[in-house]
Amino acid sequence: MSTLLEVNNLKTYFFRKKEPIPAVDGVDFHISKGETVALVGESGSGKSITSLSIMGLVQSSGGKIMDGSIKLEDKDLTSFTENDYCKIRGNEVSMIFQEPMTSLNPVLTIGEQITEVLIYHKNMKKKEARQRAVELLQMVGFSRAEQIMKEYPHRLSGGMRQRVMIAIALSCNPKLLIADEPTTALDVTIQAQVLELMKDLCQKFNTSILLITHDLGVVSEAADRVIVMYCGQVVENATVDDLFLEPLHPYTEGLLTSIPVIDGEIDKLNAIKGSVPTPDNLPPGCRFAPRCPKAMDKCWTNQPSLLTHKSGRTVRCFLYEEEGAEQS
């Protein structure tokens, strides 16, 4: 599969009294056309800031891309002006945000919000855009699409609002869909329906997905490949099968063993000790060392590089130093 998105050495910093705070620090990954890649990690790991950097929205939150490149096919998005971004945002790259209630405009009807995108990006006439909006709502599972067009967001349930967000995000047949915790506020049944819907629609349009989540159950259902982030860095990158069968990084292992199991007796839930360091108070060596059960002396003073493991996946850990090649 050919590469759609390539992120190289991405560094996104925030500033406190002119002091740089690294929220994303040297992130590398790629997404192929038609591939679903999950970006996972605890809160504060840099997942959402990575997605906002790709969308060109991090500046509005006070952040700044300090280094690296974000290439969408042959376009380097880091060189884009806001006007350039406006042409691709919602068109070639779309995003579903965590909470649909705060993402939808409360004073506009659902129909107005979908047709606005089509009129702006596809130069459709109002009547044509309205017809397409009805088709999109039917496509995401609304049987009363004409009625939903007239409703305001507060009149819809959480699952219905999320379906509307998916309809808006896919309205222009984007090449890349970024879904930031798309099932967080939904119950388990609606979660499954939304994931299945995203999967079906993206297969239909050959859309690539960057799925941002901390829910490994969602990852196992929806992703082809998984990128694990910790403290603004990628610590492991593997296919979903490899990651669940044999996690390499101690942090990935900790995430997987903390998932509760249904069968067998459970004395107590496993948990990773400690908490994620804040970006303004990072350890001098490996960022996971203070919480790692396998930490060695050099982990406390030296930062490990991202290595290509003999299995073909990448991992940032001194445990695999002898059997891996450092990424250039």
UniProtKB/Swiss-Prot annotation:
Recorded topology in the membrane: Peripheral membrane protein
Biological processes, Gene Ontology terms: establishment of competence for transformation; peptide transport; protein transport; sporulation resulting in formation of a cellular spore
Primary residence: membrane
MF GO annotations: ATP binding; ATP hydrolysis activity
Top-level lineage group: Bacteria
Domain ABC transporter: 5-256
CDD domains hit by this protein: ABC_NikE_OppD_transporters
Keyword Protease in record: no
Compartments, as annotated in UniProt: Cell membrane
GO cellular component: plasma membrane
Keywords: ATP-binding, Cell membrane, Competence, Membrane, Nucleotide-binding, Peptide transport, Protein transport, Sporulation, Transport
Entry binding sites for ATP: G41, E42, S43, G44, S45, G46, K47, S48
PANTHER family: DIPEPTIDE TRANSPORT ATP-BINDING PROTEIN DPPD, OLIGOPEPTIDE TRANSPORT ATP-BINDING PROTEIN APPD
Protein's job: This protein is a component of an oligopeptide permease, a binding protein-dependent transport system. This APP system can completely substitute for the OPP system in both sporulation and genetic competence, though, unlike OPP, is incapable of transporting tripeptides. Probably responsible for energy coupling to the transport system.
Similarity comment: Belongs to the ABC transporter superfamily.
Protein name in the entry: Oligopeptide transport ATP-binding protein AppD
Origin species: Bacillus subtilis (strain 168)
Highest classification ranks of the organism: Bacteria, Bacillati, Bacillota, Bacilli, Bacillales
Record gene name: appD
